[in-house]
Regions:
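Conserved hydrophobic/aromatic pocket- or pore-lining residues that grip, position, or stack substrates
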Residues: 148
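N-terminal accessory/pre-domain segments preceding catalytic cores
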Residues: 1-140
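Short, well-ordered surface patches within globular domains
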Residues: 145
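Active-site neighborhood of thiol-dependent amide/isopeptide-bond enzymes
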Residues: 141, 151-174
Length: 174
């Protein structure tokens, strides 16, 4: 017989267009080994598309990864993708035969429905573009980074009671 064990780390859902930004840093991804990078890509795509559930590849399981590795890989995806501000956690379902794990399903959980996440992401992009347009195009790399840093520091008010107090939505949308 096959046994399924479900564990939750939060909950909600939505639609299928990618909200991932192109060309960002892959700092956390680079810290993972090849098997972990497989799951990173699958989790990244699932969260970016707000997919209901994805079956994680079994090769990493065969190479020794298990459900204990999901959270670390999930955190790496969030480190590399602040634009996934609408993700609140995940659930997974582990499939076993005896003591052996034979499959794991992964599902992100979301604070917003898909259309609202898309709308908020667009508002964030527009505000970011406004901020970037204030930087002279001939500024040095250092001056560009400094200008963005100062804009964030001087424009962000921290409100611990705000619903988005720990993500980019609070910085760009207040």
């Amino acid at each position: 017989g096959q046994e399924a064990e479900e564990t939750t780390a939060e909950s909600d859902n939505a639609e299928s267009c990618s909200l991932l930004e192109e060309g960002g840093s892959r700092f956390a991804y680079e810290s993972l080994d090849a098997q972990e990078q497989i799951w990173y890509g699958e989790i990244e795509q699932a969260l970016g598309e707000m997919t209901d559930t994805v079956k994680l590849s079994t090769e990493p399981i065969e190479q020794g990864l298990d459900e204990q590795d999901i959270d670390r890989i999930f955190q790496c995806v969030l480190i590399d993708h602040p634009e996934i501000f609408y993700t609140t956690g995940y659930t997974y379902t582990k499939y076993s035969r005896g003591d052996r794990t034979v499959g794991i399903d992964f599902a992100g959980t979301y604070s917003l429905p898909g259309e609202e996440a898309v709308r908020k992401a667009e508002e964030i992009r527009e505000r970011a573009s406004e901020w970037l347009s204030e930087i002279p195009p001939d500024a040095s790399e250092y001056d560009k980074v400094k200008a963005v840093y100062e804009k964030i520091i001087f424009s962000t008010d921290y409100d611990l009671n705000a619903s988005d107090n720990q993500n980019i939505a609070s910085v760009f949308l207040g």
